[in-house]
């Protein structure tokens, strides 16, 4: 039974409310620079329970360096040697005070869902190759600023882990393994957990009075004695026809990702043209060598080696398809966000169109 629990796959991630607040504060204060940190907890029969977190030390960047350099250093922090030593020291100190201090992954911040890149893959692979039951928490600061918490958990799929370990992302290997951009990540449900004491306190908070029909006053004295409270009512903000700025930014990022995808596709097509050209030269050389050997055999001479083309010609190296897979996965991410953003916008546009059409 213990073996079954030990080998149970991860089904969900449970994060303490205090940990969520620490992650949100760290990511918000570091915005727009990428924020990363370590999460600790325990594995409870397939459920990762995150009970604490701490951020990685920030790297001082001179004013002459660009913002992208600071973000690159912060994104690579989880696998930096100095931070690995720092993480082990922090876990050792937490164990000394009897805190659940088993490393269960790391967290990072994102902007408009823009987190699918090589740094994210390398960080998660660094954790997951040491411990299969580690996850990456992604906090989207831009989405959370709209009022709803955006906290997602990901892990690399076993198929992608195998392919990344072997560094085989050629067309043939992807065709044989049937690995697509949809198989890179496995998203896990995230639950926010409160302690029993906090839950009891929340239940003791007085609830607002239930909405009911307000009796009309019979006289002026009734109004003075019991003034009527104006009920909450929806404002006119929902009728605003301006396009959501988050939708515009997501569309811009979507176009950039599509452009990157086409750039990678053009590079692969260039490789295919180069390969076809070299293969045609090899075929011509082999046909010529066979004709020469036939003439030499007719003249009772020893034939020349026919595998000499391997020394004379060099086939081009196929570029890795990993970048293209990540771009495709990022495009899919942006497309889902655009679909979610356009739900309200489409309804408003149809309402305006209906009023503008002649009857």
From Swiss-Prot:
Domain MPN per the UniProt entry, residue ranges: 13-160
GO molecular function terms attached to this record: metallopeptidase activity; translation initiation factor activity
Gene Ontology biological-process annotations: formation of cytoplasmic translation initiation complex; translational initiation
Keyword Cytoplasm assigned: yes
CDD domains: MPN_eIF3h
Coiled-coil segments: none
Keywords carried by this UniProt record: Cytoplasm, Initiation factor, Protein biosynthesis
Cellular component annotations (GO), alphabetically ordered: eukaryotic 43S preinitiation complex; eukaryotic 48S preinitiation complex; eukaryotic translation initiation factor 3 complex
Cellular location(s): Cytoplasm
Subunit structure: Component of the eukaryotic translation initiation factor 3 (eIF-3) complex.
Family as reported in the entry's similarity comment: Belongs to the eIF-3 subunit H family.
Functional note: Component of the eukaryotic translation initiation factor 3 (eIF-3) complex, which is involved in protein synthesis of a specialized repertoire of mRNAs and, together with other initiation factors, stimulates binding of mRNA and methionyl-tRNAi to the 40S ribosome. The eIF-3 complex specifically targets and initiates translation of a subset of mRNAs involved in cell proliferation.
The protein's name in its UniProt record: Eukaryotic translation initiation factor 3 subunit H
Species this protein is from: Neurospora crassa (strain ATCC 24698 / 74-OR23-1A / CBS 708.71 / DSM 1257 / FGSC 987)
Gene responsible for this protein: eif3h
């Amino acid at each position: 039974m213990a073996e079954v629990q030990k080998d149970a796959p991860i089904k969900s991630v449970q994060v303490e409310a205090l940990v969520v607040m620490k992650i949100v504060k760290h990511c918000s204060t570091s915005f727009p620079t990428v924020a990363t940190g370590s999460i600790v907890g325990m594995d409870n029969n397939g459920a990762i329970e995150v009970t604490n977190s701490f951020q990685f030390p920030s790297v001082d960047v001179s004013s002459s360096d660009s913002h992208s350099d600071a973000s690159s250093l912060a994104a690579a922090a989880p696998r930096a040697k100095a931070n690995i030593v720092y993480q082990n020291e922090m876990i050792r100190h937490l164990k000394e005070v009897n805190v659940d201090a088993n490393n269960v992954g790391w967290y990072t911040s994102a902007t408009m869902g823009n987190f699918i890149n090589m740094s994210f893959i390398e960080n998660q692979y660094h954790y997951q190759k040491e411990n299969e039951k580690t996850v990456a928490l992604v906090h989207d600061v831009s989405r959370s600023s709209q009022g709803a918490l955006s906290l997602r958990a990901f892990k690399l799929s076993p198929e992608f882990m195998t392919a990344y370990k072997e560094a085989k992302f050629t067309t043939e290997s992807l065709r044989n393994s049937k690995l697509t951009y949809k198989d890179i990540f496995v998203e896990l449900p995230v639950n926010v957990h409160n302690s029993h004491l906090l839950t009891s306190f929340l239940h003791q908070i007085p609830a607002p009075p239930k909405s009911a029909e307000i009796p009309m006053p019979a006289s002026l004295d009734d109004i003075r004695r019991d003034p009527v409270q104006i009920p909450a009512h929806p404002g006119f903000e929902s009728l605003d026809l301006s396009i959501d700025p988050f939708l515009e930014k997501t569309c811009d990022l979507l176009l950039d990702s599509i452009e990157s995808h086409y750039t990678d596709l053009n590079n692969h097509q260039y490789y295919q043209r180069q390969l076809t050209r070299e293969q045609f030269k090899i075929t011509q050389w082999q046909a010529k060598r066979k004709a020469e050997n036939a003439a030499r055999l007719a003249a009772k001479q020893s034939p020349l080696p026919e595998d000499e083309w391997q020394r004379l010609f060099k086939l081009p190296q196929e570029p890795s398809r990993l970048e293209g897979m990540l771009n495709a996965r990022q495009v899919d991410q942006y497309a889902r966000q655009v679909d979610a953003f356009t739900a309200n916008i489409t309804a408003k546009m149809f309402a305006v169109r209906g009023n503008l059409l002649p009857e």
